[in-house]
Amino acid sequence: MASYGEEREIQKNYWKEHSVGLSVEAMMLDSKASDLDKEERPEILAFLPPIEGTTVLEFGAGIGRFTTELAQKAGQVIAVDFIESVIKKNENINGHYKNVKFLCADVTSPNMNFPNESMDLIFSNWLLMYLSDQEVEDLAKKMLQWTKVGGYIFFRESCFHQSGDNKRKYNPTHYREPKFYTKLFKECHMNDEDGNSYELSLVSCKCIGAYVRNKKNQNQICWLWQKVSSDNDRGFQRFLDNVQYKSSGILRYERVFGEGFVSTGGLETTKEFVDMLDLKPGQKVLDVGCGIGGGDFYMAENFDVDVVGIDLSVNMISFALEHAIGLKCSVEFEVADCTKKEYPDNTFDVIYSRDTILHIQDKPALFRRFYKWLKPGGKVLITDYCRSPKTPSPDFAIYIKKRGYDLHDVQAYGQMLRDAGFEEVIAEDRTDQFMKVLKRELDAVEKEKEEFISDFSKEDYEDIIGGWKSKLLRSSSGEQKWGLFIAKRN
């Protein structure tokens, strides 16, 4: 591993070599940079919080392809880059903006300092991948200090492997897994002089759609974090990632449901239900609660559709991005809350959701959002846990409360879709199919008991067996139901 001095010298020489041309192609290390820039720049800017009148610190500012946009809205921009010729070119382009200060400096330098809580937004595009692991950690701590409470940190990195097609004699870039950045920034915390504790809350994380559309590449990933008080309640996402969908739990579920899947029946039920959608090439599909991406890859690969998969669980999206490596399919992933996420009206041909909406308390509001997001003639297909119209037994009520579920009977669920404006609503009780699938999955796990315990643990095995048997018991007693819902926007 390179020492601090060696690492900085290697990175500086690399960028001196690749910034001779001072063009967008040189900065993006890609022959199609101009076309990509036209698509990705507005996408990245749309991902940011409102910046009107704010103070923005831009690291790795380069020749200023984002500096220009930031300067037009922000109150003040401090643009920093460690290659002198590059920051001078930025100043030549953007120097007429009187609210921009240009600094030639290395972000890892001990002399790089700003007052605590002085920045509304710290922005960087392709910076951390040119720092060592320790340098990323040190800079993250400083950025947390420099950001105002309620302020934001945005960064975008190349993960897994190279994206640009420019030839390079050597490449010192650190192509990390996205979960490296997520974990490091999530664990970052500080105390101020008064003893108040602060940390970073993940607002969203997504792959850049321009690269998915143009290169079938999901490894261009951006994050948006907000500085919050450590006692802020971010309960539901934390519950999903620390309790129900811990990384170990996701791998267990995937073992049961099949590679890429964490919902009932895996690929088999996916094929059956997707066939009902009559997908056509070029259509746009939104998968709400996409999990680890198996259904999205299936739709994109077999029907040539463009899929956007969203999930509130950071762990789920991390696995989905790993599964996407090398598949070359048109699937975008984003950590997002479907009750807060905004899409333009008439965006999607299909909205698809498998065993997810049970987590949502205000289903009528969500279904109204779905209706707006769909194009006229668009379809929604949902499978979800449901319940009997009768009052739940004490045991079932405890299960529902513990999981934070909001369950309805099948017909009431269908009526909520009608009330949201949907037509041609089909609401089917598929509990018999659910039980057959559960039995098959249970048998498969029991048959490979020793292998399962070896790969996970005895406790994991008993959790899965116990959980599946409980679901079977609740379903056979008529308490737990499984519903299939299809509806159309006219």
Swiss-Prot record:
InterPro entries (alphabetical): Methyltranfer_dom, Methyltransf_25, Phosphoethanolamine_N-MeTrfase, SAM-dependent_MTases_sf
Binding sites annotated in the UniProt record for S-adenosyl-L-homocysteine: 60, 65, 81, 106-107, 125, 262-263, 289, 311, 337-338, 354
Principal EC category: transferase
Known pathway: Phospholipid metabolism; phosphatidylcholine biosynthesis; phosphocholine from phosphoethanolamine: step 1/1
Annotated GO MF terms: phosphoethanolamine N-methyltransferase activity
Catalysed reactions, semicolon-separated: phosphoethanolamine + S-adenosyl-L-methionine = N-methylethanolamine phosphate + S-adenosyl-L-homocysteine + H(+); N-methylethanolamine phosphate + S-adenosyl-L-methionine = N,N-dimethylethanolamine phosphate + S-adenosyl-L-homocysteine + H(+); N,N-dimethylethanolamine phosphate + S-adenosyl-L-methionine = phosphocholine + S-adenosyl-L-homocysteine + H(+)
EC code: 2.1.1.103
Residues given in the record as phosphocholine binding sites: 158, 163-164, 168, 175, 253, 385, 399, 403, 405, 471
Pfam families: Methyltransf_25 (PF13649), Methyltransf_31 (PF13847)
Compartments (UniProt record): Cytoplasm
Function per UniProt: Involved in phosphocholine biosynthesis. Catalyzes the N-methylation of phosphoethanolamine, phosphomonomethylethanolamine and phosphodimethylethanolamine, the three methylation steps required to convert phosphoethanolamine to phosphocholine (PC). In association with NMT1, regulates PC homeostasis, phase transition at the shoot apex, coordinated organ development, and fertility. In associtation with NMT1, involved in phosphatidylcholine biosynthesis and vascular development.
Family: Belongs to the class I-like SAM-binding methyltransferase superfamily. PEAMT family.
Protein name: Phosphoethanolamine N-methyltransferase 3
Organism: Arabidopsis thaliana (Mouse-ear cress)
